[in-house]
Every structure is written in C-alpha cells, then in structure tokens.
Amino acid sequence: MKIIHKGLVEYLPTFEAMKTFNAGRNADTEDELWVVEHPPVFTQGLAGKPEHLLIRDDIPVVQIDRGGQITYHGPGQLVVYTMIDFKRRKTSVRNIVSALENSIIATLAEYGIEAAADPKRPGIYVGERKIASLGLRIKNGSVYHGLALNVNMDLSPFTQINPCGYAGMEMTQIADFVQPCPAPDEVASKLTAHLETQLTPKADNNE
C-alpha cells in the first residue's frame, strides 16, 4: 500500500483526483492512502439535506458522492483518503469501515484518549463528543473517500451545520485532551501505521 502525503490541498481537485484514480484502476493498481488537510470547506454527501446547513457564509459547500450528510473540513484536521480494492483484498466494506474505526481508536489510545465507535451513529466519539468522521463511496469493487480526524483546528464552523445530520452534535479534537498538541504529521504517521496493519488481509499477517 502506497502512502502519499499531499499536505494542504483544495478539496475539489482532490475529489476529482479520487474519482479519476478509481475509474482508472485495474487489477494491478496499488492501493493508496492519501494524507491531506483542506482549507475550510463543507462537503455534502449523497443523503445530504439542505436544512442541515444552518448558516451560509463564505465557506464553500461542495456536493460529493460519498454516503452521509454534511461535514466540515479545515486546517488542523487530518484527512486520510482510502483508495482500496476491497474485492482484491477479499474483504467487505463493513470490514473496511471497522478497520478505519479501529485505526482511529488505536491512534487516539496512543495519546491516552479513550474513544469508541457508536453503533447508532457513524464516526468515532470521546464520550458524547465526536472526534472523527467516516464516509465512503463504493464503486467497481473499490472504495474511496475515507476518514477525518480532528487534531488541532477551529471547531466553530461545525456550529454552522448539523454534523452528519445530527442537530446539536458536539465536536472535539486531540488538542482538547493533549497539550502540547501533536502536529498532524505526527498523528498521521501513527494513524497510517495502524491503517496498514488493520487493512492487511489476515492471511498475510500469518506469513
């Protein structure tokens, strides 16, 4: 699996690049993880309802093809796009989602943060506060989009939306629990290591 660090990049060109990558895949295309941050942007998923955008300002809203409702991306949030051929890996989308969840939880545990998935709501939570979001698109036996982990960012734009369609959802981030807060690059190193482990087919782990 190839890990590509793209730095701070605009959302829309990245979204187009994901679609292009997935459309051009063949049986030999190596899976990739794209590690990025984005300038401020709201992204509205396929199930998105306009009423979940509570306040319109100068932050752009981009309609995209992942599942789910509206969320926010901004600097200081670690985003990992998972370009994975799950058919070739002989796994399921549910297992991919579990791998993403487990990787986030394990990464946060390294910083002494106890987090968990919620079977009733997508994402990862510390208590009742959401610290990470997940959203995928399934096409041609592969997935793209991925996860977003709040590290050290301005959380106030989340008050302009119902995050992932949940009114009053409180958000949190690593900086609320760890000072000095680790840089996103450090968190990315830990998270991608866990992702590689979690996404490796179990048969390969036994070799």
UniProtKB/Swiss-Prot annotation:
- One GO MF term attached to the UniProt entry: lipoyl(octanoyl) transferase activity
Q: InterPro entries attached here?
A: aa-tRNA-synth_II/BPL/LPL, BPL_LPL_catalytic, Octanoyltransferase, Octanoyltransferase_CS
Q: Where in the cell is it found?
A: Cytoplasm
What residues make up the catalytic site?
C164 (acyl-thioester intermediate)
Principal localization reads: cytoplasm
Q: Which GO terms describe its biological process?
A: protein modification process
Which residues are substrate-binding?
Answer: R66, G67, G68, Q69, I70, T71, Y72, H73, S133, L134, G135, G146, L147, A148
Q: Which residues form the BPL/LPL catalytic domain?
A: 27-203
Q: Which UniProt keywords apply?
A: Acyltransferase, Cytoplasm, Transferase
- What is this protein's function? Catalyzes the transfer of endogenously produced octanoic acid from octanoyl-acyl-carrier-protein onto the lipoyl domains of lipoate-dependent enzymes. Lipoyl-ACP can also act as a substrate although octanoyl-ACP is likely to be the physiological substrate.
Q: Which family does it belong to?
A: Belongs to the LipB family.
Instruction: Name the PANTHER family on file.
Output: LIPOYLTRANSFERASE 2, MITOCHONDRIAL-RELATED (PTHR10993:SF7), OCTANOYLTRANSFERASE (PTHR10993)
This chain's protein is named Octanoyltransferase
Q: Which organism is it from?
A: Neisseria gonorrhoeae (strain ATCC 700825 / FA 1090)
Gene behind the chain: lipB
